[in-house]
Amino acid sequence: MEHKNTIIVNLFAGPGAGKSTGAAYVFAKLKLAGIDCEYVSEFAKDKVWENNSEVFKNQFYITGKQSFKISRCFGKVDVIITDSPIALGAVYADTEGLKLASLQEFNKYEKNNLNVFIERKKKYNPNGRNQTEEEAKEIDISVKKFLVNNNISFVSVYGDEEGYDVLVKTVKELLKK
């Protein structure tokens, strides 16, 4: 199997901002355009749907599982789209060591990352979430501060169809380079 120079589209924001919707939309649009891509879903969301609250006491485990989900596709497809970037593990980290480890793992892919902050546009849906709308908006602020404070370059798009279309166009342009 040939090793591909994979672009990782990392969607950042708090819960309910449209990361999963955007990831699914961008994935579908790219796939329909014949682009070899994969959607890497959020491990933590799987645990919410399983009613597994115990796992949320171990952010190290969650971050490791998410990292593995991304790494198993890296180099095998042209584009990975994820609604749970490895660096989000640092935002939710309960120790400084985990924060540093999450950032170090994320930075392994630095040359391949397209980091995107989703600006909240849609109505908040609490179903499948552990946070209230207010808490989710606070996490939006924390995530953006985290990106800025850690010198992680990113672009912002609105969490709506128009914003996701801009992202699809951006990815297609990057693939031409």
Regions flagged by a language model, labelled:
Residues N52-L98:
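Conserved nucleotide-sensing/catalytic segment adjacent to the nucleotide-binding pocket
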Residues E96-E162, V166-L175:
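A glycine- and Lys/Arg-enriched "phosphate-lid" helix/loop adjacent to the NTP-binding pocket
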Residues L11:
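Hydrophobic anchor at the beta1->P-loop junction of P-loop NTPases
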Residues G22:
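Hydrophobic positions on the alpha1 helix immediately C-terminal to the Walker A/P-loop
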Residues M1-I8:
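Phosphate-binding P-loop
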Residues F27-F68:
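Conserved substrate/cofactor phosphate-moiety recognition/catalytic segment
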Residues K19:
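Conserved lysine of the Walker
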Residues G16:
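Walker A (P-loop) phosphate-binding loop of P-loop NTPases
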